[in-house]
Amino acid sequence: MFEAEFKTGAVLKRLVETFKDLLPHATFDCDNRGVSMQVMDTSHVALVSLQLHAEGFKKYRCDRNVPLNVSINSLSKIVKCVNERSSVLMKAEDQGDVMAFVFNNDNRICTYTLKLMCIDVEHLGIPDSDYDCVVHMSSVEFAQVCKDMTQFDHDIIVSCSKKGLQFRANGDIGSADVQMSADNENFSVLKAKQTVTHTFAGDYLCHFAKAAPLAPTVTIYMSEELPFKLEYCIKDVGVLACFLAPKIVNNDEEIF
């Protein structure tokens, strides 16, 4: 038997909102430590990793390891029904074929079931890596910068150095350049061994930035030989990490 109760529906709604347009399906691996998920998008360009700690739930029970394979599109339809102030109980029977969601808001209790999928799951290992650059900034400001950049071009050039972080975009209507310096109260450089510059698909960064309501700050990791990493620490709940492969720049052409 698996049961996990969120104190409010806000976290679940915002998590699903973050990756509903990015991932077709996901496997939630449940054990006595909590709920985890690692899923790549269909283009194998982006990876989303989620860890929800057992102690972060109002109530948590997991008698045995349970993988729950769900359609993200279907899950998003159920989550739309929840009030952010409602408590949310997720539960599933061992060897069952559905996952139940119970939304409790004062005098109204709503129960919805979601059919589980039968899919082959590839368990991915994410090694601990030593990144060249690590910066810390406001998650809302990061989301705004990504949105602004994509008004000019689909691709965003990101550079990280001891001086700070720079976002650039060059398009048909003109160009955009935003620089975050270390003296900004909402920004800090935690580590900068060398200057790192990569080009990324702006759409993916904007998808990741939807997680801004989950945490006030985001930590950005960059290296020449490693994927771009965003990490949101969800207070008292867990960690959401998003990875994105840079685009390969070859003369005037860019391909993944």
Curated annotation (Swiss-Prot):
GO terms for biological process, alphabetical: leading strand elongation; mismatch repair; regulation of DNA replication; translesion synthesis
Keywords linked to the UniProt accession: DNA replication, DNA-binding, Early protein
InterPro entries per record: DNA_clamp_sf, Pr_cel_nuc_antig, Pr_cel_nuc_antig_C, Pr_cel_nuc_antig_CS, Pr_cel_nuc_antig_N
CDD domains cross-referenced by the UniProt entry: PCNA
Domain of life: Viruses
Molecular-function annotations in GO: DNA binding; DNA polymerase processivity factor activity
A Pfam short name: PCNA_C
Presence of keyword DNA-binding: yes
UniProt DNA-binding residue ranges: 61-80
PANTHER family: PROLIFERATING CELL NUCLEAR ANTIGEN
Role of this protein: Stimulates the viral DNA replication. The virus utilizes both cellular and viral PCNAs during viral DNA replication in order to produce budded virus (BV). In addition, stimulates the expression of late genes 38K and VP39 by promoting the transcription of IE2.
Family label: Belongs to the PCNA family.
Protein name in the entry: Probable DNA polymerase sliding clamp
Organism classification: Viruses, Viruses incertae sedis, Naldaviricetes, Lefavirales, Baculoviridae
Gene giving rise to this polypeptide: PCNA
